[in-house]
């Protein structure tokens, strides 16, 4: 199953896709999704995630929260039950919180995503 937002409509026509609304999911809705589909892993590819202030910043440091469904909230919850993988290249992606010690260097990076994962990969 693919879990994304409506900005990715029709990207996966042959795969069951759930669309997270921009306002996010309740705790009960998140639990229902995880209990229904019982994922064997969680994979985030180049997905913007929250920084320490709860903001979603693009690669230029611009806040894009109004265009970003909080899929990372479901990722955090799911990562407690199955291995998680995050692929990113700018520090603002889900999973890059695993590199917090490096990304905390403000001379090199703006506010990075704080959501870690089990297996982060740099693209």
Label every PLM stretch briefly:
Residues 11-12, 96:
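Short Asp/Glu-rich motifs
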Residues 21, 41-123:
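Conserved mixed alpha/beta catalytic, RNA-binding, or beta-rich assembly cores of soluble enzyme
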Residues 12-34:
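A glycine-rich helix N-cap at a beta->alpha junction
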Residues 1-6:
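Short internal beta-strands
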């Amino acid at each position: 199953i693919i879990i994304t937002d409506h900005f990715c409509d029709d990207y996966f026509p042959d795969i069951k896709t759930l669309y997270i609304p921009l306002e996010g999911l309740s705790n009960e809705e998140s639990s229902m999704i995880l209990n229904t589909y019982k994922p064997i892993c969680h994979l985030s590819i180049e997905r913007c995630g929250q920084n320490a202030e709860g903001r979603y910043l693009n690669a230029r440091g611009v806040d894009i929260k109004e265009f970003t469904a909080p899929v990372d909230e479901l990722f955090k919850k799911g990562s407690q039950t199955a291995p998680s993988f995050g692929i990113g290249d700018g520090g603002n992606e889900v999973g890059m919180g695993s590199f917090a010690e490096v990304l905390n260097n403000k001379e090199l990076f703006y506010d990075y995503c704080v959501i870690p994962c089990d297996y982060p990969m740099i693209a």
